[in-house]
Amino acid sequence: MAKKSLIQREKKRQKLEQKYHLIRQSLKKKIRSKVSSLSLSEKTKMREKLQSLPRNSAPTRLHRRCFLTGRPRANYRDFGLSGHVLREMVYECLLPGATRSSW
């Protein structure tokens, strides 16, 4: 089980990412736009605005965690579980349709 503080930190990052998502997206779109007639100084101002946003609001700072244990590694997107928990649940027949492989 992961520390509760780490799980809360990840939830805080998710909230920040949702809050600043549209702002970050619009600034990036304006900077990357080839059609816009922005001068170099205007683009640098937009980059500074982008850099002034909180670091934890960037989507690259997010990390998937198992929703049962909070484990940050070996997560399966389809289930939202880490590999360890997924394996145990399959063995106990708690996931419908999932079976152990045998050949």
From Swiss-Prot:
GO cellular component, one term: small ribosomal subunit
Location(s), subcellular: Plastid, Chloroplast
The keyword Signal belongs to this UniProt entry's keyword annotation: no
GO molecular function: rRNA binding; structural constituent of ribosome
GO annotation terms (biological process): translation
Signal peptide positions on this chain: none
Pfam family, any one: Ribosomal_S14
Keyword terms of this UniProt record: Chloroplast, Plastid, Ribonucleoprotein, Ribosomal protein, RNA-binding, rRNA-binding
Main location: plastid
InterPro entries: Ribosomal_uS14, Ribosomal_uS14_bac/plastid, Ribosomal_uS14_CS
Family in the record: Belongs to the universal ribosomal protein uS14 family.
Function: Binds 16S rRNA, required for the assembly of 30S particles.
Subunit description: Part of the 30S ribosomal subunit.
Name of this chain's protein: Small ribosomal subunit protein uS14c
Species: Lolium perenne (Perennial ryegrass)
